[in-house]
Amino acid sequence: MGKIIAIANQKGGVGKTTTSVNLAASLGVLEKKVLLIDADPQANASSGLGIDVESVEIGSYQVLEHSATPEEATVSCSAPNVSVIPAHIELVAIEIELVDKENREYMLKTALESVKDKYDYILIDCAPSLGLLTLNALTAADSVVIPIQCEYFALEGLGKLLNTIKSVQKIHNPNLDIEGLLLTMYDSRLRLSNQVVEEVQKHFNDMVFETVIQRNIKLSEAPSFGESIINYDATSKGATNYLNLAEEIIKKNQ
C-alpha cells in the first residue's frame, strides 16, 4: 500500500513545490512508483514537471469534487516512474464549492482509495494556506513533510501549522504523523542560516531530517525548463540533496 505524504506549510516561498517536484523525481530515480498530486491553484508543481497547465482538462479540481477519478486525471511527466494529477487555475474555486458539502474534509481521502495500492508513494503539493484544500490533503495523508527556509522569520507560522496538524489528528485523521521538518535554502556562509539550523534542531530534535537542502542556483533554474533537478543537472548540489532526502524517507519507511 502506498504511503501518502503531504508537503505543507502555509508560509509561501519556503521550498514546498521545489520539494514536492524533486522528492517525487528522486523517489522515481530510486525505482519507486510515485503519484504527485498538485493541490495548489498556482499549478507550479505541474509546470515544473513539464505539464502544460493551460491544456489541463481533468485534474485535481475534478478529483476533489468527485466528477473524475484519479485514474482519469493522471498524466505522465518528464520524470521517470512519476505520474501527476495536475492542477488548473479553476482549483481556486474549489474551497467555495466544497464548503456546503457533507464530509468536505474527506473528499480527497475518499477519491484516493482507488489508487492507494498502485503506488509506493503519493505526494501532495499543498497550497500555501490552511484552508479546505490543505485540510483535505492532511486528512488524506499518512504523514506530512514541513519545509522550513533557513532565513529570518523561519519559524513564523510553524506553531499555527503544528496546531492545525494536531486538530486534524484529533478530529479527522488520528494516524497523521509528521514525516519530518525539512530545512531548505541553507547557505553555510551565512551566520543566520546556521543559527536557524541550530534553533530548529534544538527545538525539534528527531523531527528534523538529517538532509538539509542547500541554496542552489540550478534548483531555481530547473522549473522554467519543466524539469526536476535530477533531469536538469544530476551533478548539482540540489540533485544530491533531494536524492539524500528520498533515501532518508525510504529508509525510515522500510
Give the positions of each predicted feature.
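P-loop NTP-binding core
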Residues: 1-254
